[in-house]
Design a protein with these regions (language model features):
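Gly/serine-rich nucleotide phosphate-binding loop at the start of the catalytic core
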Residues: 2-8, 33-98
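A short, flexible helix-boundary coil/loop motif
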Residues: 3-6, 27-46, 51-60, 181, ...
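Active-site-proximal, Lys/Arg-enriched surface segment
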Residues: 104-183
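An anionic, glycine-rich sequence signature occurring as long contiguous blocks
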Residues: 172-173, 177, 185, 247-251, ...
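Short amphipathic alpha-helical "interface-anchor" segments enriched in bulky aromatics
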Residues: 347-381
Length: 416
């Protein structure tokens, strides 16, 4: 990559939130001002030269590069027609449609190459599992169904995808994707109904992260995820079986066994996580962390009370009762804990653990802002391979913005 791009990647991101494009009229918060070069589009050419190298033919690599450039240049929703309009008009639309929906090129090598590129630019801190509900009203897009979103707690019509995000001190960007298909939900529903469907969702969510991490080839790092509505013990066991450390957000009623003999509740059987934390609130300490949301009141530098307690899951199999830490945070010390997490990173102090949980908050914010700008939700085709190809190239476009700090918001997450 060029020296100016490298210095942008390895230095502190500015995230100035100016508008994108070299005269393309992109919307606010996505790059350089009108008439000025867009750093993300400049970086994208270098990025594509590396991560698209698995495409055998030169014309495929060029089409991939042009598609990424179209995503970066086009403001608003990223339709195939709009992308083609940025790179060549009607003839380009037909060519790009075939390249995305009907071609046979593999997307997994590109995702793995993107992970390696990011690791070299800014070493990985954590993997973050981020579900992505995509409301869609039509009948023809792949994966559309009327379904329950356990993370939002409501029904919606659309697609359900699972993203695996690479999070480092300097950037957060997606590198792995799976779509949860209606066929999987229908097969799971059967006589057992909602419980079986929820179990299928949990299994698919965990499997998507484990698969993406294994393919990425990066060093083992913690996985940050939210399992409040999809299962606790089963999810923790899946990641333990895969050899991946995890820190997972849980619900306040999750049953846990206190294993520290010096603390209230030891030997008293399973207690709900909220009660365990309330009994040790007096041991909590202030922890400082950085809020990724620039609109949050009171500035980005925060301090909240937190505590970590040694616990186990009350698993019927004693062999699976592994040592864990329950981490609690109080946004308001006069109230119940605002967030509860369990982790098998039992040697880390509460401060680094709480800051690690904020990677989930950071990615959720990015997914709703820069992820929208990159077109992660905008594929409208009928073919699942087409969705995978689109979301892979949209991830490359998002990475170009993240690497150059032009997502429209900027916050650096230093070492814990």
């Amino acid at each position: 990559m060029s020296s100016s791009t490298i210095s942008t990647i390895t230095g502190t991101q500015t995230g100035t939130g100016t508008s994108a494009g070299t005269g393309t009229g992109a919307g606010p918060g996505t790059g350089a001002g009108a008439g000025r070069p867009d750093p993300a589009r400049e970086a994208a050419d270098d990025l594509c030269a590396t991560v698209l190298s698995s495409l055998r033919r030169k014309d495929q690599r060029e089409k991939g590069r042009r598609y990424v450039q179209g995503l970066l240049a086009l403001p608003g929703r990223k339709s195939m027609r709009g992308i083609a309009g940025q790179i060549g008009g009607g003839a380009a639309e037909q060519s790009m449609h075939h390249f995305i929906s009907s071609s046979t090129w593999e997307w997994q090598p590109i995702r793995a190459s993107l992970s390696r590129f990011l690791e070299a630019a800014s070493p990985l801190t954590a993997w973050v599992a981020q579900p992505m509900a995509i409301p869609k009203g039509g009948e023809h897009s792949v994966g559309v169904a009327h379904r329950f979103d356990p993370h939002q707690g409501q029904m919606f019509r659309g697609q359900q995808a699972f993203g695996t995000w690479f999070a480092s001190a300097a950037l957060a960007t997606p590198v792995g994707w799976e779509m949860f298909l209606p066929e999987a939900e229908e097969a799971a529903a059967g006589p057992a109904g909602e419980h079986a469907a929820r179990a299928a969702y949990e299994e698919a969510a965990a499997a998507s992260v484990i698969s993406a991490v294994r393919r990425g080839g990066s060093p083992v790092r913690p996985v940050v995820l939210d399992i409040r509505q999809i299962g606790t013990r089963s999810t923790m066991n899946r990641f333990a079986g895969a050899g991946l450390p995890v820190i997972a957000r849980i619900g306040p009623s999750t049953p846990l066994l206190v294993t520290d003999p010096a603390l209230p509740g030891h030997g008293a059987g399973a207690r709900c996580a909220r009660d365990v934390l309330q009994s040790v609130k007096g041991l909590s300490t202030p922890v400082e962390w950085t809020d990724p949301d620039p609109s949050a009141g009171g500035g980005r530098h925060r301090s909240t009370l937190a505590v970590a307690v040694r616990v186990m899951m009350p698993d019927p199999s004693p062999a699976r009762r592994r040592p864990l830490l329950l981490v609690g945070e109080w946004a308001d010390p006069r109230r119940a804990p605002s967030e509860l997490w369990v982790t098998d990173l039992v040697r880390l102090p509460v401060g680094p653990l709480l800051r690690l949980t904020k990677q989930g908050r950071r990615v959720a914010f990015a997914a709703g802002h820069s992820g929208q700008e990159a077109g992660l939700r905008d594929f409208a085709g009928r073919a699942l391979p087409g969705w995978h190809r689109h979301v892979t190239l949209a991830s490359v476009a998002h990475a170009a913005r993240a690497l150059t700090g032009t997502e429209g918001y900027g916050v650096s997450y230093g070492a814990a």
